[in-house]
A protein has these predicted regions:
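Bacterial Sec-dependent signal peptides at the C-terminal "C-region" and cleavage site
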Residues: 10-25
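N-terminal module-boundary/linker segments of secreted carbohydrate-active enzymes
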Residues: 22-59
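Substrate-binding cleft and catalytic face of glycoside hydrolase catalytic domains
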Residues: 31, 65-214
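Structural recognition of the beta-strand scaffold that forms the well-ordered cores
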Residues: 38-46, 70-77, 98-103, 149-153, ...
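Noncatalytic carbohydrate-binding groove/subsite architecture in carbohydrate-active enzymes
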Residues: 127, 167-274, 283
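Aromatic/acidic polysaccharide-binding cleft in carbohydrate-active enzymes
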Residues: 250-325, 332-340
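Carbohydrate-binding surface patches
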Residues: 337-380, 414
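C-terminal beta-strand-rich structural cap/linker in extracellular carbohydrate-active enzymes
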Residues: 399-428
Length: 428
């Protein structure tokens, strides 16, 4: 009786609490005429876990037909200026990926704490030495067949939890990082004739991103060396600062994993990652999105995209974007959350008109979602690809689209669904 009365109250007041699984919520609008950021791709890092990356593994991560179709790889530069992941990078390049790299710490003897861990600062007398070493790394990588798209000056430059820290770190202020880029790293790359751009600041999260980005972009010389403005996504709310928007620099999200998974390699953690990808793309306007590691190392062995030789649901869910939202696509305007528990992002390929929609359903029930596509070439139909408790990025039928661009899709409980348009006149 109490439940019945509650449902009557919710019905009368228009609240969604007793909506049935088969009942559609608000219509999601996709406006092809309103374009946002270009997409460079999706990637991860092989550091400390899979430095050589076997051929089958490279295919799982980078093959667009049989794998999840990533298009970026982030390498670690060790304090001695080498990367143990160069063999993995060669396999990524062979599959069409862009490769870039980041250091976690300069050599201990070049820091004021004489330790690669536990923060510390790069000594002024070794700034040029470190910049030259990073530029040499980029040149050597290119000579080995791995053109270096970008070099980061420092992983998480302002992240200073209480020591002791068990990983490599080095501390910069926004001003000191800008000066290192402007006076040392940028000129060192240019001196070698490299097209390699600086990818910075790579802060630990959106919470600390603005100050570093503002320092880099407020100095015209430093800004001239910088390519993507980068951040990790461990803290804060994704957003696009006005100075970054005005600058025209792409925004890259360069590291995220669910660190609070409690050994959960299943759908619960995977949907957290899906929500983060959506928010970074839609609210943060990122052009590139990186998971932390392909295969996680201790102590977070369960937080990777792959455990053992199997992709986790987390890995397949990244593939709901990375396999279909290809480099060169552009995000277009869409209703980001058309009803409770549903997230939507939309992307188009300007040369072909292909449209890709990615919908996240975090609810415990199936949801019907109406979609209206306006202001562009309407697709005839969409193929449907689902990752859920039972499906691993598997095709699940198709949906016809009306002449007015309207259709309804069923989103399985706790799932990510990708809709890939079939172009007018195409056979499939």
């Amino acid at each position: 009786m109490i439940i019945m009365v509650l449902c009557i109250i919710l019905f009368v007041t228009g609240l969604p609490g007793c909506r049935q699984a088969g009942q559609a919520g608000g219509t999601a609008l996709v406006d092809l005429a309103v374009q946002h950021q270009p997409i460079v791709g999706f990637g991860a890092c092989p550091a400390w876990s899979c430095p050589t990356m076997e051929v089958w593994m490279a295919d799982v991560f980078y093959n667009v037909d049989s794998g999840i179709g990533m298009s970026l790889m982030r390498l670690r530069i060790a304090p001695d200026g080498i990367s143990l992941e160069m063999e993995a990078a060669k396999k990524a390049v062979a599959r069409g990926a862009l490769v870039w790299a980041a250091p976690w710490s300069p050599p201990a003897e070049w820091k004021d704490n004489h330790d690669v861990n536990n923060g510390g600062h790069l000594l002024p007398e070794h700034r040029q030495d470190w910049a030259d070493r990073l530029a040499l790394f980029a040149a050597d990588a290119a000579a080995q067949g791995v053109p270096m798209f970008g070099i980061s000056p420092q992983n998480e430059p302002g992240y200073l939890p209480e020591p002791p820290l068990s990983w490599e770190t080095c501390d910069y202020t926004p001003e000191s990082l800008m000066e290192f880029v402007r006076d040392y790293l940028g000129p060192a790359l240019a001196k070698r004739g490299l097209a390699t751009k600086v990818i910075a600041p790579e802060t630990d999260g959106w919470k600390t991103y603005d100050g570093f980005a503002t320092a880099l972009l407020s100095d015209t010389v430093a800004a001239s060396y910088v390519g993507p403005i980068a951040t990790h996504s461990y803290s804060g709310t994704p957003h696009l600062p006005e100075i970054v928007r005005r600058s025209g620099h792409q925004v890259w999200q360069t590291e995220y994993t669910d660190l609070n998974v409690n050994e959960d390699t299943g759908l619960e953690s995977a949907l957290k990652v899906a929500t983060r990808i959506h928010d970074d793309l839609v609210q943060g306007n990122v052009s590139a999105w990186h998971h932390w590691q392909f295969i996680a190392s201790e102590p977070y062995w369960y937080s990777g995209l792959m455990v053992g030789k199997e992709l986790t649901p987390r890995g397949w869910i990244v593939g709901n974007w990375s396999r279909f939202v290809r480099p060169g696509f552009v995000r277009v305007e869409a209703t980001a959350s058309p009803q409770p528990g549903v997230l939507l992002s939309a992307f188009t390929d300007p040369p072909t008109g292909r449209l890709v929609l990615v919908l996240v359903n975090t609810m415990e029930r199936d949801i019907l979602q109406e979609v209206s596509v306006i202001n562009g070439t309407m697709p005839d139909r969409f193929t449907v690809w689902v990752t859920s408790a039972t499906l691993k990025l598997e095709q699940s039928g198709s949906i016809d689209v009306s002449r007015k661009g309207m259709f309804t899709v069923t989103l399985p409980a706790r799932s990510v669904t990708t809709l890939v348009s079939v172009l007018p006149g195409a056979s499939r």
